[in-house]
Amino acid sequence: MKELTHVDEKGVKMVEVGHKREVLRKAVAKGRIRLRPETIELIKAGKTKKGNVIATAQIAGILAVKKTPELIPLCHPIPLTGVDISFEFGEDYIEATCEVRATYKTGVEMEALMGVTLALLTIWDMVKAVEKDEQGQYPFTRIEGIHVVEKVKEEG
């Protein structure tokens, strides 16, 4: 059975990575936000009241990646070498992909997950006025399927 690395009989700790070699690390995470088809069309046409939804979501996602160790208590601050956030449109969804790269001693999965999550939350925030129903609820809107689709540790 695998053991937890951040918790032992003495309590909680940040894992020691000083002995590890710095190698290329990459992680890719994906997730989707379900939206009304009319909202998707507004975003594509650039006609949302709050501005450019996609550019704002990209910026938010990149910022989230950079802030990961401040928000997840036991994550190491990692010198990132690159972050890419992209989007693919479906009829009733937007799929976000966040790729994070670093040359360091520990992986960047949490950073990729944070980036995709905040990008999707930002989309929701920017379109909530048109997604609400008459009672102010969101019967169609949901974020789903956030997961790591690729993790790379280049052995050298």
UniProtKB/Swiss-Prot annotation:
It is an enzyme of class 4 (lyase). It catalyses: (8S)-3',8-cyclo-7,8-dihydroguanosine 5'-triphosphate = cyclic pyranopterin phosphate + diphosphate. Pfam families: MoaC. It comes from the Archaea. The keyword RNA-binding does not apply. The active site is at residue 125. InterPro entries: Mo_CF_biosynth-C_arc, MoaC, MoaC_sf, Mopterin_CF_biosynth-C_dom. NCBIfam families: moaC, PRK09364.1, PRK12343.1. Catalyzes the conversion of (8S)-3',8-cyclo-7,8-dihydroguanosine 5'-triphosphate to cyclic pyranopterin monophosphate (cPMP). Homohexamer; trimer of dimers. This is Probable cyclic pyranopterin monophosphate synthase. It comes from Thermococcus onnurineus (strain NA1). The lineage of its organism: Archaea, Methanobacteriati, Methanobacteriota, Thermococci, Thermococcales.
